[in-house]
């Protein structure tokens, strides 16, 4: 197994064994929208992101950090409240 190397400004470094693939899941975001009674189209307007981007997130697609920050600002939450990184088979 590879030895972790220190990275500037990094609190933690994960070494992912070969063959393990990680994916992004936005299940937390969809639950938060339900809890706050916010529709996806309303989130798009609130955050200033395109409906296509929200659709992409609905398919667990990758979006920029800027998009995530806009959504968090609009919802008054943190990034870890709307997304998580999971082993690939768990995000389906």
Where are the regions that the model predicts?
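Short, basic-rich loop-to-helix N-cap that marks the start of a DNA-contacting helix
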Residues: 60-73
